[in-house]
Amino acid sequence: MSKQVEFDALVEEAIRQGDLANLRPVVEKELLHYDILFCLSEAGLLKSLTFQGGTSLRLCYSSNRFSEDLDFAGGPDFCSANLAQMKDCIEDYLGNRYGLEVTVKEPNELRAEPEYAEVKVDKWQISVTTAPERKDLPRQRIKIEVANIPAYTHTWRQLVRNYTVLPDGYSDTLIRVETLEEVMADKLVSFPATTNRIRYRDMWDLIWLKQQGATINANLVSQKLKDYKIDAFEKSLQARIDSLPNIIIEGNFHNEMKRFIPSSVYETSLE
């Protein structure tokens, strides 16, 4: 690898280019997202996975919302033993590129065989000490989650180059990603089904998906409900719809989105 890159200087330049001073934590995460996807793709570790979720919208479809974690569908035969090289791959690449302390925590138990009785999500947590001289700042943490459920659609898309400070080769990286229609189905299912917290970012994404021309595919939604073993969906959906006026009024939606969209987008969309 070429000489090390100073991560803090990279972040500062990305923030300056995009006028993103209020979003430093998610800009840091996004730069690391690019690194992680690039090194895993180069190592052939993404071949059996399909990128999904909010970060896939941001990095493959140019969504205006920043994201935190990397989510993939691995299919029913997935087990985390398939990705045994992931830890070393990420630690070596990020460590060598930035000279920072990087640790990857693997799933507690590597499953030798897939379990069909329930949805299983394996999580890797990546921790990067982005400012070693600042003991008061927390480490940057990113989760990679792979669920043993299928993706029913896919397309191949290049990573969107959101910053000119990124290496040229990053935007040549081809990622297998769900179609907008399937991401919409995922989010329609998860938005009302998560009862212990409100998924404000899913609200934003669903509106954005509609603006991009994505449509509701009833067959995909039905299949997702089966995959995730969700009951009483219509009741949960109606309850969530009924609660939307209060969700908007109480202010938590606005506060959440301030952390994930540029101030220019916030001012034109939510103020």
Regions found by a protein language model. Give the residues of each.
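Anion-coordinating catalytic cores for phosphoryl-, nucleotidyl-, and glycosidic chemistry
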Residues: F66-S67
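Structured mid-to-C-terminal alpha-helical surface segments
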Residues: M1-L49, C60-S63, G75-E271
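Glycine-rich beta-strand-to-loop/alpha-helix junction loops that act as flexible
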Residues: Q52-T55
